[in-house]
Amino acid sequence: MIDLRSDTVTIPTTEMREAMAQAPVGDDVYGEDPTVNALEERVAEILGKDAAIYMSSGTMTNQVAVRTHTEPGDEILIDKNAHIYFYEAGGTAALSGVMCSLISGERGVFGAKEMEAAISEKEPHTTILRPVDLHLPRTKLIC
């Protein structure tokens, strides 16, 4: 079985260590790491995109995605058990200045019915159905 939860729960095999030692290296910040460049090019090709970017963790990826789509003072709607809410040390608030509004879904999946229920519970404290009010967060992202 391959465990992809984290590199902290697996032990590299001898072959993996040898591959790491033999891999060509460079500075990925300056686009000089051939291994990272090849990975990004391959992923972009697989996904049919112009480019891809390698990020070192799922947490980093989540936070970059939130920050890309929001501004400080915004709100995101997420499932009440979302990883981004429970296991990222408040990164959404700390790094992006964004608050999370929780929705009751089923294993991270929620639909229009659950969103409507969440909105009804917050009325009139939501900007989803009302004009922007500087006292309320702007809903910008549904995760």
Predicted stretch roles:
Residues 1-19:
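N-terminal amphipathic/basic leader segments beginning at the initiator methionine
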